[in-house]
Structures are given as structure tokens and as C-alpha cells.
Regions:
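Positively charged n-region of N-terminal signal peptides that target proteins for export
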Residues: 1-5
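Bacterial Sec-dependent signal peptides at the C-terminal "C-region" and cleavage site
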Residues: 12-25
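Beta1/beta-strand and adjacent pyrophosphate-binding region of the FAD-binding site
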Residues: 23-34
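Core beta-strand elements of the Rossmann-like FAD/NAD(P) dinucleotide-binding domain
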Residues: 26, 155-165
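N-terminal Rossmann-fold NAD(P) dinucleotide-binding loop
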Residues: 37
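Conserved N-terminal/central alpha/beta ligand/cofactor-binding core
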Residues: 43, 49-50, 55-139, 143, ...
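Short hydrophobic core segments
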Residues: 161-171, 175
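Rossmann-like dinucleotide-binding core of oxidoreductases
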Residues: 177-237
Length: 237
């Protein structure tokens, strides 16, 4: 009886250790829940890898959703892959592919909140994929073949994660910088790139800000009075 009891205790201890280890170890760790981070996470999970996405906000989709730039550029004759799945979900929601053509900048336009909802639905069905929202990477180390990341949670607690593979899904290259990868800011000169359209001298110019607005037709004039100090010429393109 004593041996049986000791055996049960040992089995419980091993099970507890294994479960604890699985909580802080993943095959693939993705920092950033933008469109690239989400799709990388979905594909990784579908290939059987235990995957974790760490995202600073409540949203998924990055530029396509939380930034409001919900207009997809590209070749619309390539409807396959994860983008194809995302587009089909949009078409199902809005009533067909033609319903996505609501602007002149893209053939795939949608409300940011709808895109966020669809990304969450696509993530939720993947059993090998977890998402930590309101979480921020605060420290990153590399020991032999393992990445060790310290993640600050919403309640300010720190969780340590071990991962075999690390993916930068921040859209700004934040993790690449943290890893010491060399980078440039701005536009390279034509002498660096051998491109005729490049400037003669390199500069620190970055892409201009994009103002995004979702418009609704109320069927009547609902124009508000001009605010004090408003000058429309300041917003002319």
C-alpha cells in the first residue's frame, strides 16, 4: 500500500511538472498580433507547433484593423491561402465579394471592428495557438538554441516563456532591433540601391501619416458647423 501511495505521489509530481513546463514553453513565440503575426501563428499552429502570440492591445490585425487602414492592396486574382480565407469571411459577413468594393483605393475594404472579429474567430479555432492580449515583451535572451522572453502582463506580473523559434510580428521591427539586427531609417540613396527612382542622397523621411474615416450615408445633410480655428487648406492633399 505504501509503495502504491508513493507511486501515485510520484506520478502526480511528474504530471504537475510536465503541465507546469508546458505553460512556459512553446515551439513558436510570435511578438505582435498584426496581420503578419496572426497569419504566422495560424499557419504555425496548423503545422502542429505549439504557438503563442503576444499582443499589446485587445485587437488583432494591426494596420488592417486597429490602425484603421482596412483597405487591402495587392493582386486580387490570388484568392488562396490565409488571405483568401480572411477575404471569404469578409464576403460572408457583407454579402459577397462585390460588397467589399466600397472605395477607390482597394477592392477589399471593411470596417476595422469586423476585421478584428474575424481574426479572433480564425485564431480561436486553432487548438495549438494561444494569444496573450495586453502583454508586452520586456526582456529577451538567447541561451543555446532557446529564446527566453519575459512578458509583462496586464496586471504587471512577469511571465517567462521559452521558445524554439521567435518571430517578429510587430510590423515595426521592434524585436529585430532588440536582437541587435542592423537597420536604417528613411530612404536609401540610389547609390545604395542602384534604383533610378531613389533619391540622390539618403534621408530620414518616413511614410506620411494616413487619416482614415469610415463614412455613413444618413440620407440627409448632417454637416456640422466649422470648429473654431478650422482651416481646410491644412488638410488638402
Amino acid at each position: 500500500m505504501r509503495n502504491y501511495f508513493l507511486g501515485l505521489c510520484l506520478l502526480f509530481a511528474l504530471c504537475f511538472t510536465a503541465c507546469s513546463h508546458s505553460d512556459d514553453s512553446v515551439d513558436v513565440l510570435i511578438i505582435g498580433g498584426g496581420a503578419s503575426g496572426v497569419t504566422a501563428g495560424i499557419q504555425s499552429a496548423r503545422m502542429g507547433a505549439a504557438t503563442l502570440i503576444v499582443e499589446e492591445t485587445e485587437w488583432l490585425g494591426g494596420m488592417l484593423t486597429s490602425a484603421g487602414v482596412s483597405a487591402v492592396d495587392g493582386n486580387y486574382d490570388l484568392p488562396a491561402g490565409l488571405f483568401g480565407e480572411f477575404r471569404e469571411h469578409l464576403a460572408d459577413y457583407y454579402g459577397g465579394l462585390d460588397s467589399l468594393k466600397t472605395g477607390w483605393v482597394s477592392a477589399v475594404l471593411f470596417e476595422p471592428s469586423v476585421g478584428n472579429k474575424i481574426f479572433h474567430e480564425m485564431v480561436d479555432v486553432e487548438k495549438n495557438l494561444k494569444v496573450w492580449h495586453n502583454a508586452t515583451l520586456v526582456k529577451l535572451e538567447r541561451e543555446k538554441d532557446v529564446w527566453i522572453a519575459q512578458i509583462q502582463m496586464k496586471d504587471n506580473t512577469i511571465k517567462k516563456i521559452h521558445a524554439k523559434i521567435l518571430i517578429d510580428g510587430t510590423e515595426l521591427g521592434d524585436i529585430a532591433k532588440m536582437c541587435g539586427v542592423e537597420y536604417d531609417v528613411g530612404m536609401e540613396s540610389r547609390h545604395d540601391t542602384k534604383e533610378d527612382i531613389a533619391p540622390e542622397e539618403k534621408n530620414n523621411i518616413v511614410q506620411d501619416i494616413t487619416y482614415v474615416a469610415i463614412l455613413k450615408d444618413y440620407g440627409k445633410d448632417v454637416t456640422i458647423p466649422c470648429p473654431e480655428g478650422y482651416n481646410k487648406d491644412e488638410f488638402a492633399c
